[in-house]
Every structure is written in C-alpha cells, then in structure tokens.
Amino acid sequence: MTDMTYARYLALDILLSCQKPQSAEDDEMLFIVIHQTKELWLKQIIRELYLAKRQIAAGALVPAYKALARVSRIQAVMTLSW
C-alpha cells in the first residue's frame, strides 16, 4: 500500500494542471482560478443542500441547520471573492 500524502489525497497534480490560459493576458489566470474555485464551491453547496434535505426528512434538524449554515458561509466567501 502506498503512503497517502497531502498532494496525492487532493490530486494536486491533476488539479494544478487544469488551468490553461488561452491568451497572454495577465489577468486570465486569475479569472480561471477564481471561476474554477467558484465551481468547486457550487459543487459543495449542492452537496450540503442534499445533505440538509435528507436530515430534515429524518427529523435531524440540528445537523440540517449546520449544513445550511455551511451553505451560507460558502455563499459569503463566494461573494467576497469577486
């Protein structure tokens, strides 16, 4: 079994190769990174909303509230990042 490293766990080699600017514009890399980050945040929001929905259906309101609070915090981060 191989040792798990931070880089391997996060698949950093793949993640960091996903930014492929198409022009020589200085701001393009920033644009790509910000928008890719927002897509990842949106993916997490969807996950949290599904989790909250399941928890509410099960009557687990405190964990559902925590999931919805995470959604709110993620939205705040997204708003402040651009």
PLM features: residue spans?
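Surface-exposed peri-terminal alpha-helical interaction modules
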Residues: M1-W82
